């Protein structure tokens, strides 16, 4: 498994660039994210757009926190992304285990996009 760590201080522009990098990788692509926070009134809009952008790149998506990732999920669904390729967990520590369970014949490239601030509560 190969990891792309974009977990610090994610924003809409940086997340889009990280997805472009992930898209260049030859194997199965996984996006692991709790979504972007602290974006003010536009937070839901940006996260939905992020979900739409993820749908064009990722073979699998692991969402951390059902409530805060709903806009991302909605963006994925707007693009008719396969629900069977979406995993939702409330425990960020489980994401590494979940990514490793996805191993198949191809290499796995996992983009870790954003990390929630310590003070964030769903």
Question: Across the structure, where does each feature detected by a protein language model lie?
Answer:
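ATP-dependent carboxylate-amine ligase
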Residues: 1-122
